Amino acid sequence: MLRTMLKSKIHRATVTCADLHYVGSVTIDADLMDAADLLEGEQVTIVDIDNGARLVTYAITGERGSGVIGINGAAAHLVHPGDLVILIAYATMDDARARTYQPRIVFVDAYNKPIDMGHDPAFVPENAGELLDPRLGVG
């Protein structure tokens, strides 16, 4: 039996730009792609925390260190700059691997810089209060 499991999650990233006229995808800072073990072209689900929108697209590599989370193409109708999003990737694996697999969970600050990384999808960092809306700390 094969199971589809959580592979990677970038938690509560801030959308930095949206380009309706781009061909599609989500642009993700190369540092975040590395931290979350995402490859260019990999399928990702975007969950918009602000409005509840959910969509599936693919990742493209953004400038390293830029903090970019760019929503491209038709998805720009659903997700807007400043929105908080969760980026999720799944992997299909056999039952034995699924029982031992540890996903990559990346928490980011208001500038989309990794501040906590782990493997437990239920883990909440000590500074979770600040992560509830990292935009409050910007400025």
UniProtKB/Swiss-Prot annotation:
Enzyme class: lyase
InterPro entries linked to this entry: Asp_de-COase-like_dom_sf (IPR009010), Asp_decarbox (IPR003190)
Details of cofactor binding: Binds 1 pyruvoyl group covalently per subunit.
Binding site for substrate: T57, G73, A74, A75
Annotated protein name in UniProt: Aspartate 1-decarboxylase
Biotech relevance: Subcutaneous immunization with the double panD and panC bacterial disruption mutant protects mice for over a year against subsequent virulent M.tuberculosis (strain Erdman) infections; mice show mild lung inflammation and fibrosis despite a chronic bacterila infection. This is a promising attenuated vaccine strain.
Keywords for this protein: Autocatalytic cleavage, Cytoplasm, Decarboxylase, Lyase, Pantothenate biosynthesis, Pyruvate, Schiff base, Virulence, Zymogen
Keyword Plastid appears in the UniProt entry: no
Gene3D superfamilies documented for this protein: 2.40.40.20
Natural source organism: Mycobacterium tuberculosis (strain ATCC 25618 / H37Rv)
Misc: Pantothenate, pantetheine and beta-alanine containing compounds (all part of the panthothenate/coenzyme A biosynthetic pathway) antagonize PZA and POA antitubercular activity. However cultivation of the double panD and panC mutant with low levels of pantetheine (an intermediate between pantothenate and coenzyme A, at pH 5.8) restores sensitivity to PZA, suggesting PanD is not the PZA target.
